[in-house]
Amino acid sequence: MNSNTHAKSSNFHQSELDKFAALANRWWDADGPQKPLHALNPVRLEYVSARLEPAGARVLDVGCGGGLLSESMARLGAQVTAIDLAPELVKVARLHSLESGVQVDYRVQSVEDLAAEQAGSFDAVTCMEMLEHVPDPTAIIRACASLLKPGGKLFLSTLNRTPAAFALAVVGAEYIARLLPKGTHHYKDFIKPAELAAWLRNAGLQLEDVSGMLYEPWRNRARLSSRTEVNYLAYAVKP
């Protein structure tokens, strides 16, 4: 199935969808191509849970992939809707949900289309490791802001555009250690925190925090850090 079969939005690179769709069958393999993502997921969940009471919260996971974060939040009691434009990934996410018994409402849908249908519906929106893979990340942020209730919270993670990020996330992870498939990242699409802060302000959101996320490949572990040169998380609130 072509990855854009159900996609109305044009805010995606077909090559990016195809690249991640090809990893679908091993998405939940902790030792597979998404091994670093499995290491990052507990840290992402820790960051969100420290700022949001998950139990009973309506949460949207944008760019959910195979559902790692979606299921994790649902296990904590959140009512999770999760969207992705790759049908192959959503299929894997749904199958894993059936196996685990964790309920998540998975959809093949763009965040822009969902915003047109359900503005102001969610207590929190998460958008992790996605902004650097789309043509117009500002449109994603605007749609996320629209979907939040007043007082709602947006959680983001992405890669900083620094020499350190190029050395570690591209050269090191993809070509030397081979932790990720070659071509996973494009350095020119990485996002500086100051750029992200401006996009959030323009979307009417208040940036509350930026924290580094440090991945230690020799231990296959990740942790929060004050250093934002490579991976970082951000948290913003809708007034």
Swiss-Prot record:
InterPro entries: SAM-dependent_MTases_sf, UbiG_MeTrfase. Disulfide bonds: none annotated. The keyword Iron does not apply. It is an enzyme of class 2 (transferase). O-methyltransferase that catalyzes the 2 O-methylation steps in the ubiquinone biosynthetic pathway. It catalyses: a 3-demethylubiquinol + S-adenosyl-L-methionine = a ubiquinol + S-adenosyl-L-homocysteine + H(+); a 3-(all-trans-polyprenyl)benzene-1,2-diol + S-adenosyl-L-methionine = a 2-methoxy-6-(all-trans-polyprenyl)phenol + S-adenosyl-L-homocysteine + H(+). Pathway: Cofactor biosynthesis; ubiquinone biosynthesis. Belongs to the methyltransferase superfamily. UbiG/COQ3 family. One of its GO terms (biological process) is methylation. CDD domains: AdoMet_MTases. S-adenosyl-L-methionine binds at R44, G63, D84, M128. It comes from Xanthomonas axonopodis pv. citri (strain 306). This is Ubiquinone biosynthesis O-methyltransferase. One of its GO terms (molecular function) is polyprenyldihydroxybenzoate methyltransferase activity.
